[in-house]
Amino acid sequence: MTSMADVIILSSSPHPPRSPGPGRHDTKPVSHALPRSATPPPIRSTSDLSQPHTRSRFFPTPVASNKCPDGASKPKKRLTKDPASETSKQTAPSKPRREAKKVAGAPGTTALGEPQPEAVGKKNDAVKPTKSRSRRNAKSKDSGNMTLAGKVTKTSGDLPSKKSSKGGKKTVATKLSPSEDTSEKSTPKESNALGKDEVLRLDEAMRRRMDWTPPRETAYEEIATVTDRGSQDQDRDSSSSGGFGKLVSDYNYSGSALHPRDFVQNANGEGPTKRRRIELVNPEIQALLNGRYSDSSDQSSGQGENTGKPKKTTKGKPKKFTTLTARMTAQYSKNDAEEDEPVIDCLAGIRTTKGRQKKAKEIEKQSSSTVLSPEAAVEFLNDQDLIFGSCSQLEKDDSPETLRETQQAIRVPEGPSYSKGTHNKDPSAIQESSTRFVSKLAGTRNLWCVGARDTEGSLIQPETLNVVDLTNGEESPGKKSQDDAENPSHNTLQSDWYELEFADIDSPSEKRPSPLPTESVLDSDTQVQAPAPIPADTATATATATAVVKAAKPAKGANDTPTEAVDSQPASSQAPPMPQYTGFTDAELSKQVSSYGFKAVRGRKKMIDLLRQCWESKHGSGSNAASDSQLICQLEQQEEPASKMDNVPKSTSAAKTKATVKPKAGTSIRNRKSLDATKSTSASRTNLQTSPKKNSREKPITGTSTSFIDVEEIQDSEEEIIPSPSQVQKHYTDIYSKSKTGSWVQDHSLDILTKTPSPSPTKRKVVSSDIPAKRPPSSASIATTRMTESSKEISLAEISAQITQAVRLQPQLSPLSSSRGSRSRPTWHEKILMYDPIVLEDFTAWLNIEGLGLVGEDREVGTASVREWCESKGICCCWKKNAS
């Protein structure tokens, strides 16, 4: 009801008002947007609803003021500065003027909007048009639209004008009646005073409204400080009340974010620092500092002797740095007392200056003690022991004893495994070095020894190299000097291995026609019977034979003396017999091996071989001949599968294969008896010439007997008809390493030992006479040679054709397989054609046992050679360990 009363009062009508029809003209509402500070609009009059749609409701029509009564006062009102409304007013100024006249003269509008103001016909009607025209002309000259700021300026003190001002406050964003429109045109001069400034700000507002995101403030003069804060606030207040453009600028960051910075200023004027401001503002810290320095000033003024005590405490501070990193960074880091100095500076500091001087002196003293001249620094660097490690590790004592002990501990495992000058030392020195070496080995068992393996996966035993040195040290100086004089070019370790292999392989057939038949045949007999003591006996007899051969060739009668010496030597040294290692358990064998200073060896036979070699090097080689001859029968009975495996290529019937073991032992016994009875060279020659097959058959037997690796492995698997592939692999690897060296003995005249007895006795006679001269005194490196001599040294070109031929002949000539193979057990050729992975161990065992015998090839191949052959042919092969 108040809004309706306002409309009636603004119309300046003396008659009571009529309530307008509310629902008839609402069908055509004018779409508009209210300003932010606008109040809800009141009910509009009928004259307002009759206005055309193109006109803005914030701007009244200039023609409607002609009909106003005389007593109506014209309220002064600011208009909204809307650019859209401004443009609409500028484009069509005359058209609303004509429409306003029509609306004013319409009968329907007078009946609703104004209660017949023109029909009264008062005297003031002639006066009002002149005033309204002058106002209209002045309004047309104004530039820009006016903003409705929420208040109306007053031009007269009439009661209707006051009421109209109240109505203007309520209808800030509404369209007024024609009478109000004419009365509002009476305030152009006051609005023009502010309009000039507002026009300058409209450009900025337009620029910001195009982007709608206000750009970043770049004006530095707007940053607020403590000094110009009040002036800036005044400018902001005055500018914010200017217009819409400044209202948008108030939302920028520059105005609101500057207030916290005003409090950051330090008392000293050094700039905004958060930490110092907090320390200075806190009153508790100031109280504590004031109390502290009051006490310290009293103490310093009362006692002058106490000034030296802080120096002692400060000297102890560098001891806190326990790392190299802290020691180096201490020169550049501030102490805790130095960090308190900025707080102390703000207070009255008589004490602070003294403290600063003392700290500076202390820093100078520390730097003078650490900094050295270039020459002194170089000398210090040369004198100190370098230890590798990170600088962050805690420091230890800098004493040179600790560093030297550390370096000695580092160098101990890095030392050589054996001394190179052992061959030229006297026996006593050699024995001392040997005992020291054994103790050293006992102390240096680690993962490096465990990880020493060759290409085939078996362990490499570098400890056996030391057994050679020990054996060399145990022999007499006479033999040593003779060997050194005869073999000046064979003192290296590797050449000794090859020469030992020459002597052992050719001993059965080459010693018999020699001028000393008894000793040579005894060597062969001992080799056939005793696997372990062979090397030492062979070395002893060979050394004696070498001396006699070089001096002269005696007759038959002279041959008895060396024989008796050889026979009497075991009898005299038989007191400590070699223990029967074959009867020991695996745990006992490992304990015995560790007692000699060696690491644990994998495999029972390897441990037994190593223990026998160690026992021979310690107690002598001749003392164990008799005990080993007693043990040989038991060992050879346990070797039945191995001898069977060796003799399969030589014999085609199973009966001969089973009967080869006992004739071997019997042959050795008969040879010894015949040696004791006849002791003649002719008998040995007759034996060699009349039984060539037996000698050729004994050659592989000799190789098997000298191969220490097979003895105990066969014993472990003596109940098995076919040995395991790993045993077969090791067995044939050792045999082939000997076969390779046997071809070197005969000056490359023969490839490798063959089936047929082709070598002539005369040729063997020459070779046997030359071999003892080249043979070194030690023969304990045979096992080491077999471990290091792998079968890959065999020429692949020589045997690849035989392997290929054997694979193709298997279904035709193999007695153990079917004629064409079967689905459950295909032949090797069928497996290769079907691209089945060939297990190298099984294929090598078949070649050595059966395959190469089909093509008349007596040589045996190793797993490495078979692998090379498979890779050269493009055959898929794998190891059995990985295949499982």
UniProtKB/Swiss-Prot annotation:
Signal peptide: none
Compositionally biased tracts (Basic and acidic residues): 195-211, 394-404
GO cellular component: Slx1-Slx4 complex
Cystine connections: none
Biased composition (Polar residues): 44-53, 620-636, 677-693
GO BP annotations, alphabetical order: DNA recombination; DNA repair; DNA replication
Main location class: nucleus
One Pfam family of this chain: Slx4
GO molecular function terms attached to this record: 5'-flap endonuclease activity
Location relative to the cell: Nucleus
Post-translational modification: Phosphorylated in response to DNA damage.
CDD domains noted in UniProt: SAP_SLX4
Composition bias type Low complexity, residue spans: 294-304, 535-558, 648-665
Region (Disordered): 1-324, 394-434, 459-587, 618-707, 753-781
Residue ranges with Basic residues bias: 309-320
Family the entry assigns: Belongs to the SLX4 family.
Subunit details: Forms a heterodimer with slx1.
Protein name: Structure-specific endonuclease subunit slx4
